[in-house]
Amino acid sequence: MKIEMLGEFGYDLTLGAPFAYHQYINGVEFETINVKDTKPFYFFSEKHKELDMKRDMCYEMKVDGKYRVKRHNHSVGLHWKTLSHDKNLHEDLDHLPDKLFWHDQWTPPPYSAYYKNNFFRFEKPLYIISNKYQSEWDGGPVNFIDLETLDKIFEMLSPNFKVIYNRPKPSNIVEDHSTLMDFGDFDLIGNKYKGRVTLIQDLQSMAPQLSFNELQMYLYANCSNFISVQGGNSVLCSYFGGKNIVY
């Protein structure tokens, strides 16, 4: 079985990885195809191929060359074989059963158990703030934690927690159709919270052998407190249990 998942990050975590992991635990031979630095999400795949390309903006997954769900940029209803009364629009899904694919083939990978470690341990309990600031829907940023709110969060949490701020830079992750932007959050931390809030990029020096996504996984596995924003950010945080406040 060949599983090809080149869509957005959040869709990868909710569709591709659980489908592939289900094949793994059931002894099905499979290979996975994805973008760069996705092996951490498919640690169980012995045959994982990474392509040097951007992620597609759509929600899609191909299994043995055929769409497992309809290629589209909205997730609502996409797991159904028929998406409208016009069957001509969905002839490429005629091979699918009339049910949700995850009824019997959806098992989320145990990221927390697999990546739990004794390396990223700190004097205070971890609190990870996962943010983004990027173009969305052919417009400006929509889903993000603004500077005023970040300031309040940092002020509230830093006395009692090891606060790690995670907003990836373009050099850290594979981008999709969105453009990552700056908005002064790093300056806020550097000018007001130096020594109290740690950028995830600054932790890379502790383990330079890790890729950015590996670093995220090992950190998150030791954390049970998250604040995130809608999208792949919140999906990844939710994999690790504890409390995830989606802003």
Regions inferred by a protein language model and the residue ranges of each:
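A donor-sugar binding/catalytic signature common to diverse glycosyltransferases
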Residues: 213-247
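Structural motif
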Residues: 1-2, 126, 225
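A structural signal for short, well-ordered beta-strand segments and their strand-loop junctions
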Residues: 29-34, 128-129, 162-167, 228, ...
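Active-site and donor-binding regions of nucleotide-sugar-utilizing enzymes
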Residues: 1-84, 215-218, 233-236
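A short, glycine/small-residue-rich beta-strand->loop->alpha-helix junction that serves as a flexible
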Residues: 5-15, 134-145
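A nucleotide-sugar donor-handling region in carbohydrate enzymes
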Residues: 63-134
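Short, well-ordered alpha-helix to beta-strand connector turns
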Residues: 27, 45-49, 160-161, 223, ...
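Catalytic donor nucleotide-activated moiety binding site of glycosyltransferases and closely related
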Residues: 129-137, 150-213
